[in-house]
Amino acid sequence: MANHDPISDMLTRIRNASEKRHEKTKVPASRMSLSIAKVLQSEGFIAEINEEGEGFRKQLILGLKYTGKHRSPIIRSMQRVSKPGLRIYKNTRGLPKVLGGLGIAIISTSNGVMSDRDARKQGVGGEVLCYVC
């Protein structure tokens, strides 16, 4: 069965794995999923990114982060914003602040995929892919 929204699939896999307290999760690799994973890693939501396999069977192995004695997940929620059927674009001034700056919005811009903070610093807008907090 074909996956029509690989970004939603990636977010769902990460969300499910973190709720079940898994150490790692596998995600089908693509340039977009790698870019999103790098943003999540730079913002401190995931620990590591490794690649496995070759060609169309290539997968990303994402190491998830937890905090405290009871291993509560760092990622509390992930929400897809722009979907294949309804794209959401924002200019620099319209970029959202997630939980008053505690979370991030991942934005696809002409300069690449980045967090909302980086997009504001660079003065670019783009497609709002998802919210993470």
UniProtKB/Swiss-Prot annotation:
GO annotations under biological process? translation
Under the heading Gene3D superfamilies, the entry gives: 3.30.1370.30, 3.30.1490.10
UniProt xrefs under Pfam families = Ribosomal_S8 (PF00410)
Which Gene Ontology MF annotations are present?
Answer: rRNA binding; structural constituent of ribosome
State which residue ranges cross the membrane. Answer: none
Its keywords, alphabetically, are: Ribonucleoprotein, Ribosomal protein, RNA-binding, rRNA-binding
Q: What does this protein do?
A: One of the primary rRNA binding proteins, it binds directly to 16S rRNA central domain where it helps coordinate assembly of the platform of the 30S subunit.
According to the record's subunit comment, the protein's assembly and interactions are:
Part of the 30S ribosomal subunit. Contacts proteins S5 and S12.
User: What's the protein here called?
Assistant: Small ribosomal subunit protein uS8
Give the organism the record lists: Prochlorococcus marinus (strain NATL2A)
